[in-house]
Amino acid sequence: MSDSTMDTQLALLVWGIAVCVTLAIVVPRWIGNNSKEPPSLGGSMLSNTYQYMTDMHGFLQRVASAQRSSKIIKFRLGPKKIYMVSGEKNIQAINRPSHSISPDVFFLEVMANVWGASKEEVGKFKQDQSGRSKNPVPGHDVKPGQPRLWHGQHRVYSEYLQRTDHANALSNKYFQLFSERLTKQPLGDWTELRLSHFFESDMAEAALVALMGPRIVELNPGFWPTMWEFARLAPRLMWGLPRWVNPKPWEIRELFHGMCRRYVDAAKREFDWNGPDVDAGWEPHYGSRMARELISWAEKNLSPETTAGMVATFIFGTNANSVPMSTWAMMELIADPELYHAVREECLAASTLDPATGERVFDTQKLLSMPLLQSVYIETLRLHVSINVTREVTQPISLDGHVLTPGSLIQAPSQIGQYSEVWGCDGHPASQFWAGRHLKHDSGRPEFTMAGRTASFFPFGGGPSICPGRVFAKQEILMTVAALVTRFEIELIEWTHPDGSKSDRPAQNDQSYIGAVGIPPDRDMKVRWKRLW
């Protein structure tokens, strides 16, 4: 047995003893039987905690099984009580603004563990109870001279990431950069490539440059391997084993934060805040107006180290969702040539030839409204996004006939998107991709519909903390698919392992990403393609 293995086992043993001692102290305080409390998940506290931290896929399977008899199941993550919630009415309830539950706890955990914010910085956000809206929550005005932190950050996202003109400018910049990469492919010749590798390089870099400019890659050799490793390990910073048991995620965090710090420092040195680019939609130092405004806000309220951590998390959040979702969508289309050509026809119908350049351009709004393309998009997210929407109970609240106690957490796994009772259709199990699942044909032509199931579909979270990048993400994914299916003939050669060796099965969800992010495929697809124009 190696020294490193013995060290790991010893660390796990010490960690287990520490947990048991803690439980011995606090368990007596929990004894008592409240009939209004929801039923408990089976298993011991220690086994549930360990499985939650190391095997989210298996843990959520147990939760799903338990929720067949109760929509709310409780368990303890160490000393913290957590309610796992499903059911349309319950999901709607936790996503409504409420004085009894707060979405802030998840963001504060991200700040502390993924951004690397200090206790003092996290404390300032905790103290700010004024909310995200323009007007402070009644009775929670901040003191004179103190910033409204939640509102300040929310305003940047609302103005520069979600407002139609800024969102369209950002997606158009991305499409320009991505198209430039596609035109470098040989015209009329068949070539081979691995699909996931293409998306993780060409698509990811086009999106990064559109958002953050080119300097972050130029300043940091080895940027992409480090970014993807950070994306893989970031969920473990939130819910995984302690740093002293598993230090690797924190080591990668520090390395990637350092890269982002170089980018932030260089932009601050080189950008002229009194020059003509101060209101530009895009310039090469910061990249997009959104990035410039967000970093400007952060530098007024956070340390340079935490600002870099915020940038790192934003980059991870952007690429670790849109890239695997685009990969999955294209894998499904390529594996089904009839579907591929049907989506192509829709995309061509949403495009025109530019008379000045002869280039094909897309009407973005028309493209986003195409029924089959929308159904493919929703079906992809339904199957391949896995997040646990998290809320903190701040006052006693009744939910589904149960009373949830203050200080506890509520989590709603998006795995409900795969429940047969919600999404299953004859001949089309909820566990399988079906492009027609979100279409109806009442008028004789296909129409997109969610059929009243929106409460069972929340890949971007919900309520006041819903993902601010969802507008850009949808445009980015659909424009990527449209560009590829209209420009290329693509044929499946074989499925491969990530190292390029042949696989005996198609891709499945990589279970190590369950619970916190868009899930990438665990296999790659080797294809041959030919550029048509």
From Swiss-Prot:
A Pfam family the protein falls into: p450
Protein topology in the membrane: Single-pass membrane protein
Keywords: Glycoprotein, Heme, Iron, Membrane, Metal-binding, Monooxygenase, Oxidoreductase, Transmembrane, Transmembrane helix
Record SUPFAM superfamilies: Cytochrome P450
UniProt keyword annotation of Iron present: yes
GO molecular function: heme binding; iron ion binding; oxidoreductase activity, acting on paired donors, with incorporation or reduction of molecular oxygen; steroid hydroxylase activity
EC number: 1.-.-.-
Chain ranges passing through the membrane: 8-28
Induction: Expression is induced in complex medium (Czapek yeast autolysate medium) supporting calbistrin production.
Family to which the UniProt record says this protein belongs: Belongs to the cytochrome P450 family.
Protein name as it appears in the record: Cytochrome P450 monooxygenase calL
Gene designation per UniProt: calL
